[in-house]
Regions:
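A contiguous strand-loop segment
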Residues: 2-134, 154-293
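Substrate-recognition/cap regions that form aromatic- and gly/pro-loop-enriched pockets
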Residues: 324-325, 329-454
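Histidine-centered catalytic/metal-binding microenvironments
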Residues: 432-490
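Short Pro/Gly-enriched beta-strand edge/turn motifs at strand-loop
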Residues: 60-66, 152, 334-342
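Short, charged, surface-exposed loops that flank catalytic or proteolytic processing sites
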Residues: 144-150
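Short, well-structured alpha-helical segments that form the helix of a local strand-helix-strand
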Residues: 151-160, 316-320
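Short, well-ordered beta-strand elements within core beta-sheets of diverse protein domains
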Residues: 138-144
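Glycine-rich, aromatic-lined ligand/substrate-binding cores of catalytic
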Residues: 231-363
């Protein structure tokens, strides 16, 4: 999916949490209704078959309960997207990435091949299943991962065994670490730990720009990779580091150069998004003019950076809702020209389906540590709401999305608000901002108050109280969302 991701290490976040956030965007001309769901062990398949690639995978018998944000309309797969399991391991999948012709030749993607002819007749060729894709990954990995590193290993093993039919980036988190995995061709992959004091910005482009093969093949302190990556790179001459001998890659190399792309479309669709996110979080750098450190079309914008100050939930929401505010590229702005205002793909667009921010708080007890902040619809007009993840059910307002358009659930109410406010952006702006600030403030107070309330409860009683708190807060959000819908309608 055409998404945008930001990852924030624990020492770079405002409260010591690991933070994983990603927009899921629908493709042009298509909208996929979304809902919240808790998947229980008895609901997890033991034999899984992908709808798109027809791949069948046998799964372990010991899945954990986990949260997810699946598609509503049946027929093309689950697309669980983001969530936490019972051990407070988070996963967000996927960020669709780009690659290049050398990689596709060296390790072709594993596409589904339909059957030819009729079974039982001469010349019949049976269908060949494809590999894994975004449709599958959360369902196949999150119920079994015991840590962020373990999630990387599980998915890495699946990729090496079954392959993939698309290029993807996947985030895993626990209370101590965030790992980012990028698929390389059909069966190869690399993963890097997000530095604790840094954030990572990811548009739809292969991002990791420095990788230590020795660490990945040894201690794996900060890097992991597919088993034969070094030999495969050497065979296909994929490392582009100057001065490296032709028979092998450098111990430390740049994967973005080796495996990624620098196409003209990247400079419209991808690099501008990374440029603007980092502009917001490191504003003292030079971002404009002939002496700019980076421009919207720079190919060397860093994968990770230390921010100028600690990053908040609101910072994440702002950058993942952004449309180049304050620049000549703002599609809602008055600076520049019509050409500049339409030059680059914004992050906050009408095709945003959902935004999940996965927060793991080290100061909270494990029973209520995981908070999944959620927003639906266009991020320029919606608000994040917090949900405790250690629960058996989700509030109906978030979970009961149907294909039918209605104002009675959070997804469609936000879609309606976005459609109405988009064409009257400036007239509706004040009402939208008031709603976002009020709901955000309500959310932070809710978490503070419920943390205190459940801290004195026996652990066995905590999930039920968290579910009750989620439900009560959802009703308050419903009131505020209905009020905003009325304001933008009039």
């Amino acid at each position: 999916m055409p998404c945008t991701t930001i990852l924030v290490g624990k020492n770079a976040s405002y409260d010591g949490s690991t933070l994983v956030a990603r927009n899921e965007d629908s493709s042009n001309g298509v909208f996929e209704p979304k809902r919240m769901r808790v998947v229980h062990p008895d609901e997890q398949p033991r034999v899984y078959t992908s709808v798109l690639s027809h791949l069948t995978v046998e799964l372990p018998d010991n899945p954990m309960r986990y949260t997810s944000v699946p598609d509503v309309v049946p027929g093309h797969g689950i697309w669980a997207e983001a969530g936490f399991n019972e051990l407070n391991v988070g996963m967000s999948a996927t960020e669709t990435l780009t690659t290049n012709e050398r990689v596709r030749g060296a390790d072709p993607l594993v596409d589904y091949v339909p059957a030819k002819g009729n079974e039982g007749e001469d010349g019949y060729v049976p269908a060949q299943p494809g590999g894994l894709g975004e449709e599958d990954m959360v369902t196949l990995v999150l119920p079994y991962a015991k840590s962020a590193r373990d999630g990387v290993r599980i998915l890495g093993d699946l990729l090496e065994r079954y392959g993939t039919y698309e290029n993807n980036g996947i985030a895993f988190s626990d209370v101590d670490e965030i790992w980012w995995l990028e698929t390389i061709g059909g069966h190869h992959w690399i993963a890097k730990r997000v530095p604790d004091d840094a954030y990572v910005t990811m548009p739809n482009q292969l991002g990791i720009d420095s990788f230590d093969l020795d660490d990945a093949e040894g201690a794996q302190a900060d890097h992991m990779c597919s088993a034969d990556l070094r030999a495969w790179m050497a065979e296909w001459h994929l490392d582009l580091t100057l001065g490296v001998e032709g028979d092998g890659p450098a111990a430390v190399f740049n994967p973005r150069e080796a495996f990624g792309s620098h196409s003209d479309s990247d400079h419209v669709y991808n690099t501008p998004r990374a440029w603007y996110m980092q502009r917001c979080l490191n504003p003292s750098d030079v971002w404009d003019g002939p002496d700019a450190d980076y421009t919207p079309e720079s190919d060397d914008i860093p994968w990770s950076r230390v921010p100028e100050r600690k990053v908040t939930i609101e910072d994440i929401k702002y950058v993942l809702s952004s449309h180049y505010q304050g620049t000549e590229y703002d599609c809602y702005g008055s600076k520049g020209t019509p050409a500049t205002r339409g030059a680059y793909r914004p992050i906050g667009i009408n095709r945003n389906s959902q935004l999940a921010v996965l927060q793991l708080r080290p100061y909270a007890q494990p029973a209520y540590r995981a908070v999944q902040w959620m927003a639906f619809g266009s991020n320029s007009f919606n608000a994040l709401v917090p949900l405790y993840a250690n629960v058996e059910t989700m509030p109906e307002y978030y979970a009961d999305t149907q294909a039918r358009v209605t104002s009675e659930n959070f997804y469609w109410a936000n879609r309606l608000i976005g459609a109405l406010a988009d064409v009257r952006f400036h007239e509706c702006g004040r009402a939208v901002e008031d709603y976002q600030e009020k709901v955000g403030g309500m959310g932070h107070k809710q978490i503070h108050d419920i943390d205190a309330a459940v801290a004195v409860l026996p652990e066995a009683e905590v999930p039920a109280e968290l579910a009750r708190a989620n439900e009560e807060f959802a009703e308050r959000v419903r009131v505020e969302t209905d009020a905003l819908l009325g304001k933008v309608l009039y």
